[in-house]
């Protein structure tokens, strides 16, 4: 059951592929008119017929067909997506093709993304040449399993590969937007074949701090925030959560006879973890799925965080955990916080134990290339350079290090890193009682006399700051009584996670 309609409705998010971005520049003519149909010149190579021989038909879509083909020079077998120029009657159809090629190029080389070779064109068609995957769709393998479900071990292998794709997309400023079993192919028919993401037709580049306002995707896998017209990278993780639920129990977590009924289920109801086989599935697996299917996208695990979860770790180890885009965003955001908010976050970070910080430990280790227990300016530069939409200059990176580096030694240790990258909203949503306990403990570090308030004198004593403290208190002092209550302190901490995860994204549901 799909939500896909014409692609003309989806460009209202201000993304690079949309009205204001790079996706339009290449398409615009001298007067801003995009040539369509046979008039379209994509600038791709024109020698497809000389390079490849088309073979059997593999499948077809709205605008074209996919064929097996052979490279005339190397005899290598490939897949070719042939798109009819005559069907590109609107400029957005031209943009869609250019964007898909751009995305395939951006993700080139990732082990779980179908390999892109080249794009060609002639007067009638565009040809996108890709890796040939002959193992069939993930959906077909699910249906072939007994009771249409995987063992936990096999499911974890599949889910890990999907999460790696999502994390890589998000680092490149991309959201897939149509994660579903049909869009993952196995390289071969072998049982242990690698999984490859394909069909980036609904994917798009995102601008940090923005959200998509259109409804796209496939009904069973669409995230609540997509239906609310305010979606971003987190929607991919929700879709993977739905797929994981299906892999483990053979049923969809949200189902109804109608599309609108499915949407109501997604928005209002929680998945059922009581029916068989869930009582026989490990608590660790259930915890994993539940944290991917959190309705609030701010509290949902990111793709990189999910890869650090105990259930999905390869052999119990966090092997090749990619950088988490939200961790990099949080570090940039930390610079903008008031001194009091920074101190409050450091106090909160100090209350967490090693198990609660396992995902951030993985991220710290990924950035700490020389494994000396601290992050240098150069290591942080290298990490932030991988955040494609941002790629900060040297002075900006130094500014981040100086803000995070509380002991002013020019390095970032793990405790400093945690304070700057903590997902406060996840703490609030995942375990309310634990949040209350941790925030109380952080508050108590400032409330020296234990009277239930933080005064300017106590703040000065705990921070060592000189000069007037009153301006620092004003941000949190909602009732203007000159001191900070526990509720006001908690409110201040919660605002730390409000802006750092607000990032934006593209479409097989399609509603304008």
Curated annotation (Swiss-Prot):
Q: How is it modified after translation?
A: Autophosphorylated. Phosphorylated by MPK5.
The catalytic activity, as recorded, is: L-seryl-[protein] + ATP = O-phospho-L-seryl-[protein] + ADP + H(+); L-threonyl-[protein] + ATP = O-phospho-L-threonyl-[protein] + ADP + H(+)
Q: Which PROSITE patterns match?
A: EF_HAND_1 (PS00018), EF_HAND_2 (PS50222), PROTEIN_KINASE_ATP (PS00107), PROTEIN_KINASE_DOM (PS50011), PROTEIN_KINASE_ST (PS00108)
Gene3D superfamilies linked to this entry: EF-hand, Phosphorylase Kinase, domain 1, Transferase(Phosphotransferase) domain 1
Q: What class of enzyme is it?
A: transferase
Major place of localization?
Answer: membrane
Q: Where does Ca(2+) 2 bind?
A: 405, 407, 409, 416
Question: Can you give the residue ranges of the EF-hand domain?
Answer: 355-390, 392-427, 434-469, 472-499
Recorded GO MF terms: ATP binding; calcium ion binding; calcium-dependent protein serine/threonine kinase activity; calcium/calmodulin-dependent protein kinase activity; calmodulin binding; protein serine kinase activity
Name the UniProt record assigns to this protein: Calcium-dependent protein kinase 18
Its ancestry begins with: Eukaryota, Viridiplantae, Streptophyta, Embryophyta, Tracheophyta
């Amino acid at each position: 059951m799909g939500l896909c309609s014409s692609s003309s409705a989806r460009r209202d998010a201000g993304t690079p592929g949309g009205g204001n971005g790079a996706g339009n520049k290449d398409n615009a003519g001298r007067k801003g008119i995009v040539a369509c149909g046979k008039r379209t010149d994509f600038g791709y190579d024109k020698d497809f017929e000389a390079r490849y021989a088309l073979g059997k038909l593999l499948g077809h879509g709205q605008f074209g067909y996919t064929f097996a083909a052979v490279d005339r020079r190397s005899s290598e077998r490939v897949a070719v997506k042939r798109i009819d120029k005559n069907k590109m009657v609107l400029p957005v159809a031209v943009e869609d093709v250019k964007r898909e090629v751009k995305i395939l190029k951006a993700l080139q080389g990732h082990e779980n993304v179908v390999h892109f070779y080249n794009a060609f064109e002639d007067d009638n068609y565009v040809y996108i040449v890709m890796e040939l995957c002959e193992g069939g769709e993930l959906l077909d393998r699910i249906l072939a399993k007994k009771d249409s479900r995987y063992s936990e071990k096999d499911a974890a292998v599949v889910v890990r590969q999907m999460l790696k794709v999502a994390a890589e997309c998000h680092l490149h400023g991309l959201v897939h937007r149509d994660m579903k079993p049909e869009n993952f192919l196995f390289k071969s028919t072998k049982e242990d074949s690698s999984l490859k993401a394909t069909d980036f037709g609904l994917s798009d580049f995102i601008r940090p701090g923005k959200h998509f306002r259109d409804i796209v995707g496939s009904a069973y896998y669409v995230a609540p925030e997509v239906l609310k017209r305010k979606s971003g990278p987190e929607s991919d993780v929700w879709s993977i959560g739905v797929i994981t639920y299906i892999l483990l129990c053979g049923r969809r977590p949200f189902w109804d006879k109608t599309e609108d009924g499915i949407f109501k289920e997604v928005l209002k109801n929680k998945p059922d973890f009581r029916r068989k086989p869930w009582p026989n599935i490990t608590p660790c697996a259930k915890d994993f799925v539940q944290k991917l299917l959190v309705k609030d996208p701010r509290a949902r695990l990111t793709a990189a965080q999910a890869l650090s979860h105990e259930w999905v770790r390869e052999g119990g180890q966090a092997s090749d955990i990619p950088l988490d885009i939200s961790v990099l965003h949080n570090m940039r955001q930390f610079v903008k916080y008031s001194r009091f908010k920074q101190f409050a976050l450091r106090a909160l970070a100090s209350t967490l134990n090693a198990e609660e910080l396992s995902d951030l430990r993985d991220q710290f280790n990924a950035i700490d290339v020389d494994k000396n227990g601290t992050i240098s300016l150069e290591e942080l530069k290298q990490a932030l350079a991988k955040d494609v939409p941002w790629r900060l200059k040297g002075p900006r990176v130094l500014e981040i290090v100086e803000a995070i580096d509380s002991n002013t030694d020019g390095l970032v240790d793990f405790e400093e890193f945690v304070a700057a990258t903590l997902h406060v909203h996840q703490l609030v949503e995942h375990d309310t009682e634990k949040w209350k306990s941790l925030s109380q403990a952080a508050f108590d570090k400032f409330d020296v006399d234990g009277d239930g308030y933080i005064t300017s004198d106590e703040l000065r004593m705990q921070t060592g700051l000189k000069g007037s403290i009153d301006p620092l208190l004003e941000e949190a002092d909602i009732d203007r009584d000159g001191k900070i209550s526990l509720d006001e302190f908690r409110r201040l901490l919660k605002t730390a996670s409000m802006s750092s995860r607000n990032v934006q994204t593209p479409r097989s549901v399609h509603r304008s």
